[in-house]
Amino acid sequence: LKYIELSGNVGILANGAGLTMTTMDAVCYFGGTPANFLEIGGDAYTKGRDALEIVFSNPAVKSLLVNFCGAFARTDVMAQGLVQAWEELKPTLPIFFTIHGTGEEEAVKLVRERLGVEPFDLMDDAVIAAVEAAK
């Protein structure tokens, strides 16, 4: 896991450094401020619990934006780890997802059924919702 704490209030969790930076840029573009850079790419993409514990250690975080895009890394595996950790930790933060790529259908179904959250089709829509929720 690669983590850098920042001064904002929108928590960010994405797979891959480029996607994480793009997500941070989008948060800024839509008037928010990122609370962190947290990238779970490479062999860390199954470490959902560790990632959530890191995000939740920052009391400034008011919403969590998850952006998964998988080619080699399977989005269903990433979602499984994150959903399981979410159920164990029972946070009260609002969470917003975009999920695209390998295993997408299963990942979306998992997030819908177990978290009761509807993933966004477009990253911009998820970002706008996360920024609004953090206000």
Q: Where do the protein language model's features map onto the residues?
A:
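Short glycine-centered, acidic/aromatic-flanked micro-motifs in structured strand/loop junctions
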Residues: 68-70
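A short helix->loop->beta-strand "cap" motif at the edges of active sites that frequently abuts
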Residues: 91-95
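ATP-dependent carboxylate/acyl-activation modules
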Residues: 1-66, 76-80, 84-88, 100-135
